[in-house]
């Protein structure tokens, strides 16, 4: 079992943190985030160090302990540096373009796919075959990147489709005669 929750979480420089009951708020140069910690977990802020402890030694409390630690660390990283996911489009005629706040994707369908981007996440298209999703909330950035990838995931034979830049594809061999 991982003991990630035992490590104290230092509040980064440039970030202010406050705890009100089970609500922890972080404010930094990129914005402001808050997280409601589960009732099974106690959170304390002392001298710019956040410590997370389970209320008791039940299995549920210990599992929420590590998750709460990771979520608090992620909101600190998000308001300080932000998060970013890069997507790569490969395939003949597959491309992306930015239309105001929306992304227009040409993915080999009979129509173009238009994805509406939420206001708290920014999307850039530096090249027609590259999409960069960035924001302060790690969950939302990952969710939007996964939704865009879901329109045309990479296929195993030619590798056409949308994939993460750091994703490795398992390629298959075509059938033999």
Swiss-Prot record:
Record GO terms (molecular function): rRNA binding; structural constituent of ribosome
InterPro entries membership: Ribosomal_uL6-like (IPR000702), Ribosomal_uL6-like_a/b-dom_sf (IPR036789), Ribosomal_uL6_a/b-dom (IPR020040), Ribosomal_uL6_bac-type (IPR019906), Ribosomal_uL6_CS (IPR002358)
Similarity comment text for this entry: Belongs to the universal ribosomal protein uL6 family.
PROSITE patterns listed in its UniProt record: RIBOSOMAL_L6_1 (PS00525)
Assembly notes: Part of the 50S ribosomal subunit.
Entry keyword annotation includes Membrane: no
A single cellular component GO annotation: cytosolic large ribosomal subunit
Disulfide bonds: none
Keywords in alphabetical order: Ribonucleoprotein, Ribosomal protein, RNA-binding, rRNA-binding
Keyword Iron: no
Entry's transmembrane regions: none
Function: This protein binds to the 23S rRNA, and is important in its secondary structure. It is located near the subunit interface in the base of the L7/L12 stalk, and near the tRNA binding site of the peptidyltransferase center.
Protein's GO biological process: cytoplasmic translation
Gene transcribed to yield this protein: rplF
Protein name stated in the entry: Large ribosomal subunit protein uL6
Pfam families (alphabetical): Ribosomal_L6 (PF00347)
